[in-house]
Structures are given as C-alpha cells and as structure tokens.
Amino acid sequence: MMGGECKVHQLQAAGDGGPGAVAPFVAKTFHMVSDPSTNAVVRWGGAGNTFLVLDPAAFSDFLLPSYFKHRNFASFVRQLNTYGFRKVDPDRWEFAHESFLRGQAQLLPRIVRKKKKGGAAPGCRELCEEGEEVRGTIEAVQRLREEQRGMEEELQAMDQRLRAAESRPGQMMAFLAKLADEPGVVLRAMLAKKEELAAAGNNGSDPCKRRRIGADTGRGGVATGGDAAEMAQSRGTVPFPFSVLGQVFY
C-alpha cells in the first residue's frame, strides 16, 4: 500500500490546484483501477478507455475505505459524474472519460470538476472532495444505525415470544396442581364451560336438560367417577382448546 500511496502522490505532485495538477479523486481512482491485485473487483475495460466495477459490495467494503475513507458507492458515483465521467453500459457499472485511459496518466490533469455557474474559488476542489467524503461517511453511519434499530426490534420480538413460550408450562402445572387438589371444582368448571358453549350454539338449552345435569351430580354438586364417565360418554369429551379457572389450554 505504501507503493500505491507514492504513485498517487506522484500523480498529484505537479501542483496544488495549479496548472498540470491532478485532482486527488482522479489520481486515487486511476491508481485503484490500474492496480492488478484488485482486478477481481475493479479493472480496465478491454480497450483501456473504460473501467468496470465488477463487485460493488467488495468495492464499497474494502477499496473505498482504503482510498476515500468511506464506504458509500453512491457517493463515489456522484463524484465521477462531477468530473465528467459517464456510465457507458446501463446493465453494469462501467464508466468512461476521454482523458481517463489505461497507461495515460499524463492526461489526468485534463479531468476537472464541472464548473457551477459563477465559477469556483481556487482551492475549492479539494474542499469539495473532502465534503463528499464526509457526506459519504455520514450516510454510512445513518445506514448502520437503521440496521442496528432493525436488529433491536427483532431481538425484542424474539424475547417476547420466548417469554410467552416459557409461561405456558407454568400455566399447565398450575392447572394440574389445581386438578389434583380440587378435582370437583375443576370438573364443575369444565362442565359449566361446556354448558356455556352449548347454550351459545343453540341460543339457549332445554331447562329439563339442565335439571338432569344437576340431578346427576353427587353430594356437594361433585360428580362421582362413574357419573362423570357416564356424563362424558353421553355428552362427548370436553372440547379443546378449553378454558378453566381463567386459563386457556391447547
């Protein structure tokens, strides 16, 4: 990388903003494209009068930070446009400039920023390029913050699902403990729930049927084992999901 930096400095050695000077952005781009070790990412076109970015992701992640201190590919393309480069192929990242040719570094001073109305003050070129790099860095930070925010929201949703899954075994254990301690209460609650469902489905049930249910229960309103089995056989099993004592089980 030291040799590459020397070459970039040599391209800029003609002066700082004076005649024959090469803009820092142009010098860095020329060296980056000419480096054979990065041909898998960016290289010259076959005729040597264009250059192609073959892997925009790797270009943004590795080359841009090395040369321009940011990772924003869109900012790099914007700077190319300000120096008069044009995109020659709509289906790939291939750019050209009449003075940006392979092996023709002496032509680089001809590549200058497009002048705005009113012209530009001397020395503004470097300042504008630094502003582009700062803007690219800010956009990259904003993108990282958005990604972090999305990850935090996803983690919160996963935590809520995990808490809900952890609470279900506790609810079932509480129900089973209640069933062991007071089987009659639970059975009455189950039968009452089924009565409620039947009444909702039939817009009211037969009063005689309700009286028969009360007569079938044993002392204290608790059905005996045989009575409960007979009732379950005649009335069908308790439908699932069902709710007992305010808890819903599936």
Swiss-Prot record:
Indicate where this protein resides in the cell: Nucleus
| PROSITE patterns, per database record | HSF_DOMAIN
> Mind telling me what this protein is named?
Heat stress transcription factor C-1b
Q: How is it modified after translation?
A: Exhibits temperature-dependent phosphorylation.
Instruction: Answer yes or no on keyword DNA-binding.
Output: yes
Record remark on domains: The hydrophobic-rich region (HR-A/B) corresponds to the oligomerization domain.
Q: What is the lineage of its organism?
A: Eukaryota, Viridiplantae, Streptophyta, Embryophyta, Tracheophyta
- Family, per entry: Belongs to the HSF family. Class C subfamily.
- Quote the InterPro entries the UniProt record gives: HSF_DNA-bd (IPR000232), WH-like_DNA-bd_sf (IPR036388), WH_DNA-bd_sf (IPR036390)
Q: Where is this region: Hydrophobic repeat HR-A/B?
A: 144-180
Name of encoding gene: HSFC1B
